[in-house]
């Protein structure tokens, strides 16, 4: 078996169709690349709401309603959070709730709908939620220039969460908001980054037809000093360090998790199925994103390293289009090119590039957050369940997950996370097979089981999310079954509910949500009496009625 040398190299390569696959045996890709850890910088005064960091330097409310107040005061002692940071052991699964995408204003200087946020946090606390998840947008917090950080609006939110006894999962969102499922607002990358992408369009992921994607910087340029003297990975590391220093007083007590964005929608994947401008529609197979000159240069070097230079000119020329199905494409059909020596070579390279990207950013994150007690690092992996029942798993392959009938694509990811002690956050936990279009061979349940097994075998904590907004008991039942109704060692370490908004605070939805949270977090989940849970949830809904109504109205405006 020949090994691939996947070292990054610069230089352009012609984007022409590759030669027909040859009969040769190709090995799995070479080992991962680790970025060196960097010594942390001293924390600045928390009184300063806006930070300016030299990029050239070394990388380093209103009172509660009486009924709600009585409800909180009546809770047993052990149910109150320890804001000081000492978490008590819980048997169930803690539930977090995603904040609206536009929680912080685009200028970064405050919160949108502040009164709604305040009422919402109090309501979530009353329902037993552990905390919230919020996107810390690169395009907001470092918008004005390299090293000029503005966390003012996020500081306001952290203080509000702490006051209400809620924990925070902070997402380092290095991607654009807009263009993916559920994106209701648009928050582009920092304007100084977009200026560099305009000068060098190969910094954007590119498909076979030359279409550029500006959601996230191409991983092919990870190690290139293309952002005013810094590499993208250095920019990500500097941003995370600035966040850590600015929120030092909240780390480990209020901020308990840093989810590190690694691609579109914050997920470790390629932007193979962009919804913007109708490019992709479910359940299309998507397209490979390897046609910027940095990616093509790496592909060329990898092909030469295995003695097959003709394989290094471009990706598969017969892999179809965004909205095709596997059988439409010679590459993805039952015995197609994916299952040939050429296909194995290409998929090994393509998926290994994604793994190395994750390794580099995780190394940077570990260098920043290692030694910060009480703070976990997590990485989000996409739940691409359509065409999972086919042999080629085409939609997973174009996204960078080399998962087929013959090859496990999630074990390598889990092992990478294990090296850094990171949590694997996975989506589509709420889905059942029979709810999906059967002709697309969707298998969300089997996919979740496969990822859970990979996490378990690698010793990695598994956390979950619902991929789409769901407020019905059927979805809640599926989440409870998948995440909580298991032996303790197989339970998810956390679940994040998508998403806070006016629909969540509709009376029936809110009552069902309160019952769901109780089922997830109660000790001995399988022994919980459903009728008792419903009664208690009704009590929460009644006690928080005015608060929830206020939140629903404010969030609708």
From Swiss-Prot:
Residue positions of the active site: 267 (proton donor), 465 (proton acceptor)
Organism from which the protein derives: Oryza sativa subsp. japonica (Rice)
Entries under PANTHER family matching the protein: BETA-AMYLASE 1, CHLOROPLASTIC (PTHR31352), BETA-AMYLASE 2, CHLOROPLASTIC (PTHR31352:SF54)
Protein family: Belongs to the glycosyl hydrolase 14 family.
UniProt record, GO biological process: polysaccharide catabolic process
UniProt entry keywords in alphabetical sequence: Carbohydrate metabolism, Chloroplast, Glycosidase, Hydrolase, Plastid, Polysaccharide degradation, Transit peptide
UniProt catalytic activity: Hydrolysis of (1->4)-alpha-D-glucosidic linkages in polysaccharides so as to remove successive maltose units from the non-reducing ends of the chains
A GO MF label: beta-amylase activity
Full protein name: Beta-amylase 2, chloroplastic
EC number: 3.2.1.2
Functional note: Possesses beta-amylase activity in vitro. May be involved in cold resistance by mediating the accumulation of maltose upon freezing stress, thus contributing to the protection of membranes.
Gene that this polypeptide is encoded by: BAMY2
Compartments in which it is found: Plastid, Chloroplast
Thermal effects: Optimum temperature is 35 degrees Celsius.
pH sensitivity of activity: Optimum pH is 5.5-6.0.
Residues binding substrate, per UniProt: 135, 175, 183, 380, 385, 427, 466-467, 499
One of the record's GO cellular component terms: chloroplast
Keyword Phosphoprotein (UniProt): no
InterPro entries: Glyco_hydro_14, Glyco_hydro_14_CS, Glyco_hydro_14B_pln, Glycoside_hydrolase_SF
Transit peptide range per the UniProt entry: 1-38
Superkingdom as given in the UniProt entry: Eukaryota
